[in-house]
């Protein structure tokens, strides 16, 4: 008869080690060395010593957490947000803005094997003009939670303030919480989005069950008292306008309308500077034919059209193409053509690919633009500006251009999301004559 024994669980005592941090990675983690291995330690900065314990041990690197900080970096800051360290939104409020920008620029330079020529930045606080706050009803307390997810968790941090939001949105937080917490339907609320446009403030409420007439009336009164445009979203497809008209924002001398669910850059200040610098780098001439790939609703396309002879924008989301066409008409731009095409498919047979272009701009999503790089090379543009939200795919796509005889003329770090681990960038490629 076979006998089975439970294996004894191994108990290990986590050893406390003392480390000196010599670098900060782009995600805001302190970097140290111990026994020949790289350690990543959240919460520590260069020039700091600390006692830490290893939480994850891999072959090439390890992760650790702080037990006790023994010294402070001169670039350590007191976080402005009381939720910092618990809320998953920000990772670097404890570091000076200058250190954040230097560490991100250094990471970008290492990846691209090229010096970062400039940092395009704006105000480091009160910059975010869009936020989605999760909502969760707690039956025990009969209270409504409203906030962001905890770091590495689906739990919600009940947010009372958020200093990276534009002041208009941060001031609204307690009022929105009070309003939503008084609804009969607070058990059936998914999330609320707040957007600050030039035209005013938008509030989009996702609800998972029909709202009573009393709740609708209460929300409408709230929107009027706070001067909000209110939209109700019973599902991911339907959007009902309760109050307000088509929102819009100013961008580089143009007025752009958008739907509340459309993607717009959350940092208006950096977006304005980024668009202006892209046009400057491309050196757009009145006779130029310019191609804008992954163009969205025309963030770059329409400003380009104010300077070039003709501009073609290509985008995979039909609603954004329609919005781009509408905004071209509103701004009296008749030299723009938008195409709805999937740029992840074979682009050689797409109508835009038959045209000739002098200059190209592309602003792909995180997956990058591998599918269009060879077509761009065939077009032989003089200058190419690549705007990236993922340095890894940027480095990959850049290889194709470098092999084809292009060189990196300028490389900028875009500080689009201060105090977070997000790294955005923009590169100018020039064709070698």
UniProtKB/Swiss-Prot annotation:
CDD domains: AdoMet_MTases. S-adenosyl-L-methionine binds at residues 265, 294, 299, 315, 342, 363. The keyword Transmembrane does not apply. Its EC number is 2.1.1.190. The active site is at residue 389. It is an enzyme of class 2 (transferase). Keywords: 4Fe-4S, Iron, Iron-sulfur, Metal-binding, Methyltransferase, rRNA processing, S-adenosyl-L-methionine, Transferase. It catalyses: uridine(1939) in 23S rRNA + S-adenosyl-L-methionine = 5-methyluridine(1939) in 23S rRNA + S-adenosyl-L-homocysteine + H(+). The keyword 4Fe-4S applies. InterPro entries: 23S_rRNA_MeTrfase_RlmD, MeTrfase_TrmA_AS, MeTrfase_TrmA_CS, NA-bd_OB-fold, SAM-dependent_MTases_sf, TRAM_dom, U5_MeTrfase_fam. [4Fe-4S] cluster binds at residues 81, 87, 90, 162. GO terms for molecular function: 4 iron, 4 sulfur cluster binding; iron ion binding; RNA binding; rRNA (uridine-C5-)-methyltransferase activity. HAMAP family: 23SrRNA_methyltr_RlmD. PANTHER family: 23S RRNA (URACIL(1939)-C(5))-METHYLTRANSFERASE RLMD (PTHR11061:SF49), RNA M5U METHYLTRANSFERASE (PTHR11061). Catalyzes the formation of 5-methyl-uridine at position 1939 (m5U1939) in 23S rRNA. This is 23S rRNA (uracil(1939)-C(5))-methyltransferase RlmD. It comes from Escherichia coli O157:H7. The gene is rlmD.
